[in-house]
């Protein structure tokens, strides 16, 4: 009879989570291209427009966690993430800040909000993440947020490199990245506490690490879709038309 491996200690488990950072999308060639100043304006615009679809789904995936969570104290803390992104009326929060980034890179907010530039591969990846959060237990869903461990580095990298490489981007567009530096660190502290307290057997810890890898897969796949369309010029249906004929806004 095979003996079940012993659970990782808290520190070992935390380190295993941190080690997943080697697969974070900061290392994706598309992000490296943007960081090194090698991206065209069209490529920057495409990233901003497609990432908008991820941004507007952040409150939905956080609401899914809250809907499944019976712990009032957890909900009281988690709701701040929704407020950060949606804002408190009439403030538009992170969503509005992202639209200012879109304008800063030369897009119109109407074009971005229409989602006409959102690639199917990006839409499928984001939808898969939201649907996972709806179906998973609240603890598992919360643990998938721990890619935020690596987020301050990626936001700082944009603040460090983009103004130098892309002087045509209006400085007001960087507000979102600046705000997320502190927000992400706060969110990580809460999410990490939940995760370390919730997954205490080897099987649970192994599953949680797979969940985190799933989230990393989502982020990487988004950039894969952008690379295919805007680096290799192979957008969906490129072999038969140059028009953006893929579905848009079907599930609004």
UniProtKB/Swiss-Prot annotation:
Gene Ontology biological process terms from the UniProt entry: pyrroloquinoline quinone biosynthetic process; sulfur compound metabolic process
Substrates-to-products reaction catalysed: 6-(2-amino-2-carboxyethyl)-7,8-dioxo-1,2,3,4,7,8-hexahydroquinoline-2,4-dicarboxylate + 3 O2 = pyrroloquinoline quinone + 2 H2O2 + 2 H2O + H(+)
Top class in the EC scheme: oxidoreductase
Protein name from the UniProt record: Pyrroloquinoline-quinone synthase
GO molecular function: pyrroloquinoline-quinone synthase activity
Alphabetical keyword list: Oxidoreductase, PQQ biosynthesis
Entry EC no(s): 1.3.3.11
Function: Ring cyclization and eight-electron oxidation of 3a-(2-amino-2-carboxyethyl)-4,5-dioxo-4,5,6,7,8,9-hexahydroquinoline-7,9-dicarboxylic-acid to PQQ.
Family: Belongs to the PqqC family.
Listed InterPro entries: Haem_Oase-like_multi-hlx, PqqC, PqqC-like, Thiaminase-2/PQQC
HAMAP family: PQQ_syn_PqqC (MF_00654)
Organism whose genome encodes this protein: Acinetobacter calcoaceticus
Pfam families the UniProt entry points to: TENA_THI-4
Coiled-coil region list: none
Pathway in which the depicted protein is active: Cofactor biosynthesis; pyrroloquinoline quinone biosynthesis
